[in-house]
UniProtKB/Swiss-Prot annotation:
Reaction(s) this enzyme catalyzes, per UniProt: tRNA(Ile) + L-isoleucine + ATP = L-isoleucyl-tRNA(Ile) + AMP + diphosphate
Subunit structure: Monomer.
A Pfam family reported for this protein in Swiss-Prot or TrEMBL: tRNA-synt_1
Recorded name of the encoding gene: ileS
EC number of the protein: 6.1.1.5
Cofactor requirements of the protein: Zn(2+)
Taxonomy of the source species: Bacteria, Pseudomonadati, Pseudomonadota, Alphaproteobacteria, Rickettsiales
Protein name: Isoleucine--tRNA ligase
């Protein structure tokens, strides 16, 4: 009669991609995601905001990384008993959609769009923005991320847009909006301004080489004729160089020659020293520190002495404009001393073009100089510069330089390499240009944002006061209007007659319908533009209220996501107030200038609250050489192919166990080796323990039960380690630290596989089904089932497969041959999936859930950790692992016995209880105990230079010297050196054996030492051979396909004399292999091996 098998038969070489496909189908067929939400009563919720991506392109690795993090914490909080709604969202408006549509329609520029028709253009945008929505759903689903796609919000939905209108009017009513003409970063390729924070996104600064030009402006005023200079410049000093200067010229340097036609002022540094450099009848004015750079151009030998003046003495001097375009502009063409001009590059003199520089505009406005901006929306000169009309500004540089040479104002041209901002959509260089725009007056409440930021837990922590905190401290007013087409229109109507000014701002569809008397079904352009009405302030009745053409910056919409998704305040008011702020959000670190920032601005201005309480800023993924992942470079694999080869759990672990979750970079290779290594080193060890349990439990027809009652020392130890791991995972995920959580999982399974299972093999293998054997199965079952729940958020599909196999095997279906073929063809190892044995009886417990993701997080509250046992057994493990490492470095195989190990420790009495275990594990004959550590080793101080160097940079030389001399003293909780107290993270004490001690290693945090006796006697060598023979026979049994319980006949044929070995160790060999030596039988299997380079033929047969 066949054995009853309670668990599925699983391969040790499983096809994890095929298993994952089965799990995805199981989730879908059984509606597990929805059950995970419905199963929580909502009294305790975890509020999660899902930042909306654009759907006009496929997801990339950055999206997958963010999605993995989002999914981990949503799943974790669910098993912790909280209700976690996960509504997906889509960014639909803005430049990404417009640029894509222009490309698809074959048009470019505002004029072309207007001629094409705004209605048709926006209709195309509407259709195209969701082009890849189904692909997104495929990717997101395949990565095992649970989100609600059916109820997703879209920023182009009327309800969402209406909430945006409400927010705008609220800001307007609070006095936090203004319309202003300001210099802002401007994309001439997109014909729209950008926010200052958009120039900080996605590494938008690029290295660029520009022509820098030095030009001379002729002063209208001669210095020696000005009373202020009379006592400083003597007539005699002038006469020594040829008499009165005919001209004074001030030298300026700029990397944007195209702005020179718009020059209206010059700025010098108040406290900078300027030299008066004579050349024939001309006296040049230049920063004294820059004179040497222009020696050639000014004809200097380097030996000259010059008169020096302060920049403040140049204040108010007049100069002649370079060009006559704006020569009559009021209050212009004067020198002003300021504090923002610095020495360094250039001449220490800055030309001011208030239409193209923020500082320029501020200075000129303060001096009563209005700006000029002779550049149109496409970055081309207007008719105000007639000889350059229609020329793109960057193409005009050479023409301007030629003209300067002709006029005699040119001095020098050089190539200047610098980091320059580029458009984040078109990658074209930006210009800074004065444009009319609506602004959120961020500067009025930025101090409050800084205060509210202190309520947010940032991961990594330094983001709070550095990356994000500094950005808030220096926040500027936010330009939120864009002169584009596809976006939420600004709800501002103005009178078309300046004689009768009026501005109306609308915050709801109801207000619009009331004033304009029409039903509003679409808030987009051009429909909203058609809403006009007579100006109530015009008694003549001739003027009309018309909407301004601008639409919102799409970042305003992203920042409106918390209330926009709920159509607040028009609906769901109570829901929103209960779901704001979010408990958690996550994006990559550049979003401190993007989504995180816009959320913070609007949340502070509208609600005086932080928008979220916990935020992870992860790093970026690069290729193996450190380059950005790019289709053009073809330097990354399709994620779906990676999933089909290794499974998505492996990619999840690869990413979330790395430093990228702490804001650092992750380099990932195109061939997937890193993911394969994760599969090999993380996923497979977990599966191996599960495979071991099912294989032997089925062989013994035994069921495991959740039990913590065993008193076996190995059981108590592993169950204690289990509770420690479960607690560590919980603590780590509570602190938003996946890296530590994954380490806790890996560390536990290393101990489970390499210690508990290996040291308990005899208990599983023995034929008696006694209490000890059942305890071993119960303990292993308890570990696997408990860890499946604890790590379910970290490896959701492998956890589900293990949990179902242990608890709900009746629902584990056999994979179809089609699945097997598909999986095998894409798998590097032709791996096998989970299959169900024919004589299979499911093991179901009354308190089991249908899915691991419907369980509650394990507490193990009834089990007390045996801390003393854990500490001692950890030391035993440390001793054994170090001993095996020494063997490895000395090329001494583990089967080769050694005479002894010497242990020098304060805890020898505790270790003696495990002496036999140590002897067996590391294969030594005896254990010698000592406590006189100083006779064997000394402690050396190792400094953590990066950490201590930041705190004590000036003392590092002295500390290094003292550490080498041993001039330090250990104290409670630290160490003193050179008058400084170091904490435990700033140093490490390393136990260093004396040079004559061989085979030594430290353990127990460098407080204890072990020494292996590496001398091999003839007797030890012979016993080693016997153990080799056992291994050869065991391998032959496995290769022959024998069962672990089959007894066998053995014959060994060799020219190498094995008689002494068989005589002395024959009983040991047969006992270990369930065999007996025999001759003259027909073997079932023959194996050929080598022992010390001697060929051996090994014959075995079932007896």
């Amino acid at each position: 009669m066949a054995n009853t098998k309670y668990y599925p038969e699983v391969s040790s070489n499983a096809n994890f991609a095929a298993i994952e496909r089965e799990i995805l189908k199981f989730w879908q067929d059984n509606n597990i995601f929805q059950k995970s939400i419905d199963g929580r009563n909502g009294e305790s919720e975890f509020i999660f905001y899902d930042g909306p991506p654009f759907a006009n392109g496929l997801p990339h690795y950055g999206h997958l990384l963010t999605g993995f993090i989002k999914d981990v914490y949503a799943r974790y909080q669910t098993v912790k008993g909280k209700k976690v709604e996960r509504r997906f969202g889509w960014d639909c408006h803005g430049l990404p959609a417009e640029m894509q549509s222009e490309k698809e329609l074959g048009i470019s520029g505002r004029l072309a769009i207007t001629n094409f028709g705004i209605e048709k253009f926006n209709a195309h945008c509407r259709a195209s923005v969701m082009e890849y929505a189904s692909d997104w759903e495929e990717y997101v689903t395949r990565q095992a991320r649970w989100v609600d796609f059916k109820n997703s919000y879209k920023t182009m939905d009327k309800n969402f847009m209406e909430s945006v209108l409400w927010a705008f009017k609220e800001l307007y009513n609070k006095g936090l909006l203004c319309e202003s003409m300001r210099v802002v970063p401007y994309s001439w390729a997109c014909e729209t301004p950008l926010s200052n924070f958009e120039t900080r996104l996605d590494n938008s600064y690029r290295e660029r080489s520009d022509k820098a030009v030095t030009v001379s402006f002729v002063l209208r005023d001669k210095l020696h004729e000005i009373p202020a200079f009379a006592g400083m410049i003597s007539r005699e000093s002038e006469m020594t160089v040829g008499g009165d200067y005919q001209e004074y010229r001030i030298l300026t340097w700029t990397t944007t020659p195209w702005t020179l036609p718009s020059n209206l002022a010059i700025a010098v540094g108040s406290d900078i020293d300027y030299a008066l450099v004579p050349q024939e009848n001309i006296c040049y004015i230049i920063a004294a520190s820059s004179v040497s750079k222009y020696a050639k151009e000014l004809g200097l030998s380097g030996e000259e002495n010059f008169e020096i003046i302060k920049g403040s003495q140049l204040q108010g001097l007049r100069y002649k404009p370079l060009f006559d375009y704006f020569e009559h502009h009021p209050n212009s063409f004067k020198i002003f001393d300021v504090d923002f001009v610095v020495e360094g590059d250039g001449t220490g003199v800055v030309h001011m073009a208030p239409g193209f520089g923020e500082d320029d505009q501020i200075l000129c406005e303060s001096k009563g100089i209005s700006l000029v901006c002779p550049v149109d929306n496409s970055g081309k000169f207007t008719k105000e510069i007639p000889d350059l009309e229609g020329v793109q500004v960057f193409d005009a540089n050479d023409k301007i330089i030629i003209k300067l040479k002709e006029q005699g104002n040119w001095l020098k041209t050089e190539q200047y390499i610098h980091n320059y901002p580029h458009c984040w959509r078109t990658d074209t260089p930006l210009i800074y240009k004065a444009v009319p725009s609506w602004y959120v007056k961020v500067t009025q409440f930025k101090d409050r944002m800084v205060e509210l930021n202190q309520q947010i837990n940032w991961i990594p922590h330094h983001v709070k006061d550095n990356l994000f905190g500094k950005w808030l401290e220096n926040a500027r007013d936010w330009s939120i209007s864009r002169n584009r087409f596809w976006g939420t229109p600004l709800p501002v109507w103005k009178s078309d007659d300046p004689k009768y000014p009026r501005i109306d701002v609308y915050g709801s569809i109801e207000e619009l319908e009331k004033d304009f008397g029409v039903k509003v079904t679409d808030l987009h352009r051009p429909f909203i533009d058609k809403l006009t009405r007579p100006n109530p302030n015009d008694p003549t009745g001739k003027s009309t209220m018309r909407r301004i053409e601008d639409v919102f910056d799409c970042w305003f919409e992203s920042g409106s996501m918390p209330y926009g998704q709920a159509h607040y305040p028009f609906e769901n008011k109570e829901w929103f107030e209960d779901h704001f702020p979010a408990d958690f959000i996550v994006e990559y670190s550049a979003q401190t200038r993007g989504w995180f920032y816009t959320l913070m601005v609007l949340s502070t201005a509208l609600f005086d609250r932080p928008p979220f309480l916990n935020c992870i800023c992860h790093g970026v993924i690069l290729d193996a050489t450190g380059q950005k992942l790019s289709k053009r470079l073809n330097n990354y694999a399709d994620p779906l192919e990676l999933f089909d080869q290794y499974g998505s759990d492996a990619l999840r672990v690869t990413m979330l166990s790395s430093n990228i979750v702490k804001g650092q970079e992750l380099l990932i290779d195109k061939d997937g080796k890193m993911v394969f290594d994760t599969l090999r080193l993380f996923i497979k060890p977990i599966w191996s323990s599960y495979h071991f349990f099912t294989m032997y439990a089925n062989a013994d027809s035994l069921k495991g039960e959740i039990s913590f009652a065993s008193e076996n020392v190995l059981d108590v130890y592993i169950l204690s380690k289990l509770k420690i791991a479960v607690s560590k995972i919980e603590e780590s995920l509570d602190n938003f630290d996946t890296q530590t959580a994954y380490h806790a999982v890996l560390e536990f399974f290393e101990v489970l596989n390499n210690w508990y299972i290996r040291r308990s093999r005899a208990r599983f293998w023995k034929s008696e089904k006694d209490t000890d054997k059942q305890n071993a199965y119960n303990t292993l079952y308890s570990c696997l089932k408990t860890m499946a729940i604890a790590m379910s958020a970290l490896v959701p599909m492998i956890s589900e497969a293990i949990y179902k196999g242990l608890c709900h095997c009746e629902e584990t279906s056999t994979l179809s041959s089609r699945d097997l073929i598909a999986g095998s063809s894409k798998s590097i190892n032709n791996l096998n999936p989970v299959v169900k044995p024919r004589d299979y009886t499911p093991s179901v417990h009354h308190n089991d859930q249908i899915s691991v993701h419907l369980c509650n997080y394990p507490t193990l509250s009834d089990f007390e950790i045996n801390h003393e046992l854990v500490a001692t057994m950890d030391n035993v493990l440390d001793i054994c692992s170090n001993s095996l490492f020494i063997r490895s470095t000395k090329n001494i195989r583990v089967r080769q016995p050694l005479a002894s190990i010497t242990i020098i420790s304060k805890h020898n009495n505790d270790l003696k209880a495990f002496e036999n275990l140590i002897k067996d594990e590391i294969n030594v004959k005896s254990v010698i105990y000592c406590d006189d550590l100083e006779n064997y080793a000394s402690k050396k101080l190792s400094i953590n230079f990066p950490m201590l160097g930041k705190r004590l940079p000036a003392k590092m030389k002295e500390i290094i010297a003292a550490s080498k001399k041993g001039d330090w003293k250990a104290i409670a909780g630290g160490l003193t050196i050179c008058g400084e107290t170091l904490n435990n993270e700033e140093y490490k004490l390393i136990l260093e054996p004396y040079s004559h001690i061989k085979g030594a290693a430290s353990f127990e945090n460098n407080s204890s030492l072990l020494i292996l006796d590496l001398e091999l006697t003839a007797e030890l060598i012979e016993e080693g051979y016997a153990r080799d023979i056992v291994r050869f026979i065991q391998q032959a049994r496995k290769d022959a396909g024998f069962s672990i319980t089959d007894r066998i006949l053995i014959e060994i044929i060799s020219e190498f004399d094995l008689s002494e070995i068989i005589y002395n160790y024959g009983d040991f060999i047969t006992e270990q292999t369930l065999g007996e030596f025999s001759k003259n039988f027909t073997p079932d299997y023959v194996s050929k091996v080598e022992l010390e380079d001697h060929p051996i033929q090994l014959k075995i047969k079932k007896s």
